[in-house]
């Protein structure tokens, strides 16, 4: 534990009450659109490295995380994410590794929303 408190969407009590709030809450973030795009292309079997460069990698670059490689992800699917106990055991096929990585990215990106 770091001791840091989550302050996402937190506003002053001066502006919020039991019956009303002036805080805008995005219902669909641009990051979620990019993740949905990449996952849909991967599930259809049409995902390319160019698609990853337009969708997943900008999200990872913003967090200073290494770029995702389609070839590398599919060559070495994460066993933790593929496990029936801890992940998505139902994911199969040629794009198994990259689908698992996209789902991990979604978990990280949308945490606490």
Where are these regions (language model features)?
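Acidic/polar-rich alpha-helix caps and helix-coil junctions
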Residues: 1-113
């Amino acid at each position: 534990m770091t001791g840091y408190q989550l302050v996402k969407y937190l506003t002053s009590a001066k502006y919020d009450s039991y019956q009303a709030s002036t805080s805008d809450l995005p219902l669909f973030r641009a990051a979620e659109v990019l993740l949905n795009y990449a996952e849909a292309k991967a599930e259809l079997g049409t995902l390319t490295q160019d698609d990853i460069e337009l969708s997943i990698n900008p999200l990872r670059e913003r967090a200073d995380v290494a770029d995702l490689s389609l070839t590398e992800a599919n060559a070495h699917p994460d066993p933790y994410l593929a496990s029936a106990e801890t992940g998505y055991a139902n994911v199969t096929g040629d794009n198994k590794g990259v689908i698992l990585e996209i789902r991990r990215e979604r978990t990280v990106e949308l945490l606490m929303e």
